[in-house]
Amino acid sequence: MQQLNPSEISELIRARIAGFEGRVETRSQGTIISLSDGILRIHGLEDVMYGEMLELPGGRFGLAMNLEQDNVGAVVLGEFSGLQEGDVVKCTGRVMQVPIGKALLGRVVNALGQPVDGKGAIDAEEFDVLEKIAPGVIDRQSVDEPMQTGIKSIDAMVPIGRGQRELIIGDRQTGKTAVAVDAILNQKGKDVQCIYVAIGQKASTVAGVVRKLEEYGAMEYTTVIAANASESAAMQYLAPYAGCTMGEYFRDRGMNALIVYDDLTKQAWAYRHISLLLRRPPGREAYPGDVFYLHSRLLERAARVNADFVEKFTKGEVKGKTGSLTALPIIETQAGDVSAFVPTNVISITDGQIYLETDLFNAGIRPAINAGLSVSRVGGAAQTKIIKKLGGGIRLDLAQYRELAAFAQFASDLDEITRKQIERGKRVTELLKQDQFSPMSVADEGAALFAASSGALDDVEVANVRPFEKALLAYLNSNNKELMAGIEEKKDLTDDLKKQLDAAVKQFKSGSTY
C-alpha cells in the first residue's frame, strides 16, 4: 500500500494557494420597490447608466429610462408577469444591442432581434447598439440615384432617391402598407436589402405581409421586425431603432438598403404610454416634450454616405462605393388631419410626403395619391431620365384636372380648352391606377407615360384606358423586345428610341383590339 508523504501534501497545497486567482466581480444591485404596467421603480442602483440593460429574475431584462434622486424608473422588455416587489435587479454594464448582418435576411424577428418565425436560431455575424448618432454633414453625399418603387404615380410625380426619407401619410385603410410592400417587391434583383418594421399591428396582418413577401420571392432579401399589438409598449418603442441598426449594417458597408416603418404613429403612442407611466410631464396631446427627438434621431440615420465614410468604416476593405439607407416611414392620420402633432413633426423631418386620400381610395383611384399635397423635396435630382422627361406634365395635368373637375360640377357650358383638359385628366387618372403586387419596370412605366404624353390616349374611351395600357405593354414586350430592352438599359428616351416607340404605339393602335 502506497504511503502519503506529508511533505508532498504540503507542497500540493502550497502550489494550489500560489495559483489561486482572487477575482472579485462588483455589480451594483437594487430591489424593485414598485411594479405596474411593465414599469419598474428600483431602489439601490447607484451607478446605473441611462439606457443600460438591467438583469431581472427569470432571465428577463429591463431598460433604465428615468434616473431619479432616490430610485430608477425602468421598462421591462417583454413579459412582466411573475416579477414582484423585493426582487433583486442587477446592472449589466451594457447598453442594448441587436444582431446585425446578412444572416437576418429572410427572417422574422422581434424588437430584440430574437427569431419568432420558428426557423431556429440566427447565426449573426456581430451585434450593434440600438441608439447611434446619425452620420455627420461631411460624411453624407447628395441623393442622386433613383429608388424605383415600380408604382407609376410615385415614380412620375413624387420620385424617391436612395438615401431619402419619404413619408407615406393617410387615414387608416387608404393603402399605405400596400405602397410600401410594392416598393419592397420592386427591389428584387436590384441588390437592395429591405427591412420591414411592423409596429403595433395585429399578428394576422404581419403574417399576411410575410406570406405575400414569400409568395413573390421578396423574403430572401428582406428582414421583418414584428412588435405586434400584443407586445409591451417598450418593444413597440424600440422596434424602429432595432430595424434601423440592422439597415445601417448594409449602408456602412457600401450597400443599399430600404427600411419601412409601419407605422410611427403607433411608436409615438407607445412612447407616450411609457412616458406617462414614468411620470414625465405631458405636453401637447399628452405626448412628452421630446417626441420630436424620438422621430428625428431615428429618421436622420437614413442617409446616403460617401465613399470616404465607407472606406474608413470598413478599414479600407470597401473602396469607391457609397452606401445608402432609404426610409419610408408611415404615419396614420385621424380624419385626414395632417396638422396634428406627430404628422407635422414627421413631415418637417422627412424629405417629402406621399399623401393618400380616403375619398380617392373610395372612388377606386388606387394608389390614392393626392397630387397636390404630395411632394418629393430631393427625389427630382435622382429621377430616372425617361420618367423625368415623360412624367413632368403628368402632375400638372392631374392637379389642373382635379381643380377643374370640382369647378365643372357647377358650370353647364365649358369652353373647348377646359373640356380637353378635363378629358385628358380623366385618362391620366385612369392610367395611373395600378393593381397591388404588380410593380412595373422602368421600360413599362416609360411606355405607359409616353402613351399619355404623346396624345395616344386622347381618342381612347376612359373605360378602355387600362385595357389599352395592358394590351400595349404586352404588344411591346412581345413584338418590340429590343426597343424595351434598350429603354430598360439606358433609362433614357433618346431621339432614336422616341421615334421607335412612337412608331410602335401607332402600329399597335392601327391593328390591335383592346
Swiss-Prot record:
ATP binds at residues 170-177. Keywords: ATP synthesis, ATP-binding, Cell inner membrane, Cell membrane, CF(1), Hydrogen ion transport, Ion transport, Membrane, Nucleotide-binding, Translocase, Transport. Signal peptide: none annotated. InterPro entries: ATP_synth_asu-like_sf (IPR023366), ATP_synth_asu_C (IPR000793), ATP_synth_asu_C_sf (IPR038376), ATP_synth_F1_a_nt-bd_dom (IPR033732), ATP_synth_F1_asu (IPR005294), ATPase_a/bsu_AS (IPR020003), ATPase_F1/V1/A1_a/bsu_N (IPR004100), ATPase_F1/V1/A1_a/bsu_N_sf (IPR036121). Its EC number is 7.1.2.2. The record marks 374 as: Required for activity. This is ATP synthase subunit alpha. The lineage of its organism: Bacteria, Pseudomonadati, Pseudomonadota, Acidithiobacillia, Acidithiobacillales. Belongs to the ATPase alpha/beta chains family. It comes from the Bacteria. Pfam families: ATP-synt_ab, ATP-synt_ab_C, ATP-synt_ab_N. It is an enzyme of class 7 (translocase). Its main location: membrane.
